[in-house]
Structure formats: structure tokens, C-alpha cells
Amino acid sequence: MILFMFPVFFTFSQGPLTEIKKPEVFKQMFSEATRKTQTIEADFIQEKNLSILSEKIITKGRFMFKKEKKLRWEYTDPFHYLIILNNGMMFIQDEEKKHKIDIRNNKMFAEINYIIMGCVQGNLFNDEKKFLSSFFENSGSFVVKLKPLASNLKEYLSEIWICFDKNDLSVTRLEMHEPSGDCTNIDFSGTKINATIPDEKFLVP
């Protein structure tokens, strides 16, 4: 798998990327959009590329987010798998198996929660102690490239790419690259911002 070490050649459907000359302007725009965003929901298609397999693993599902720190990530095809994050607690349901984890007492899951929430809200690039950030754009997207600086993150992530729609700054694509060469790409569609989502969707049993 080719890691995107040369961003000027990296392309999306809207054309090649160019580096943003004033990233502070983008950060300000994004901060304002985030402040106004109370909920997000979208469909997603996840594509897992494993170096040991010739075929890609494709899964589909539904994603929901609600301030503060509430997230529901539900795979519906070809299997059912549910993850709920709610104020320091993580609930996982794998078919009939159920697990509940107090993230605050588990360093590994705390990091997972940090990355998931940071990717969804797009604010990982503000953490200069943990990530080196680069900013790019084309006609339809802003793209933030993140390289982990913390040793514990480098163990399982080499790069993260977060793509934002220029119209509403919602996340449209997320790419997570691993040191092994494996890669997970997630494309979001049908995104609704500030639609009503009942709290029951985020209950941890």
C-alpha cells in the first residue's frame, strides 16, 4: 500500500490538492462550525485494505454523534456490530455478545475514544503534542493530514487523513494508515447536521 507521503500528488474527485497557505484561517472557520454543531448523523461505507488479503473488506452502517461526547457507530451490513461511546463509557455489542468498558480506567480504550471523537469532531489537528498537522485543499474539500508524534500512537497509526466538505465542513472521508501498510477508509454520505437525535440512541445498558 502506498502511503500518501507526497500530498501535492494526492487527488480526490475534485482535483489535486494544494497546501493551504494560511491554516489558521481554516482552523478559525472550523472552530466556528464546530461550535454551532450539536448533532451529526450519516451513513458510512468502510473499506479495509489488509496487506495479507487481495480483496478489500467492505462494511456499511450508520453513524451518530451528539454533544457532549456521545457517539453511536453501528455496522449493519454484512453483520451487526454496535459501538456506543457516552461520557467515559464504551458499550460494544457483537451479535449476541455484549461488553461494557469504563474508558477512564483503561488507557488503550481511552486513546481509542480520543482518536474516534477527535476524528469525528475534526479537532485532532489542534493537539500539537500528539500530532503533526498539514493542511490542503482542492475545489470541493479541505484535507488535514495528521502524523502521530506520541510513541503509543505510532505503534498502530502512521497517518490519518480527514477530509471536510467545503460547504458545511462536515467530515466526508476518513483514512487511517497503519505502520504495517494496512489501511482503513471510511466514506460518509447523507450527512445531516443538527437533526434531532434522541438520547436513547446513546444509552449504555
Segments predicted by a language model, with ranges:
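Short hydrophobic/aromatic-rich beta-strand segments that constitute the beta-sheet cores
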Residues: 44, 71-75, 90-93, 144-146, ...
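One face of beta-strands
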Residues: 38-46, 59-63, 69-73
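Short, surface-exposed charged micro-motifs
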Residues: 60-62, 72, 80-82, 132-134, ...
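Anionic-ligand binding region
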Residues: 115-124
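An acidic-aromatic
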Residues: 62-114, 184
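N-terminal leader/targeting segments and the immediate start of mature chains
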Residues: 12-55, 200-205
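Hydrophobic h-region of N-terminal signal peptides that target proteins for export
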Residues: 3-13
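Gly/Pro-enriched, hydrophobic low-complexity segments
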Residues: 101, 124-205
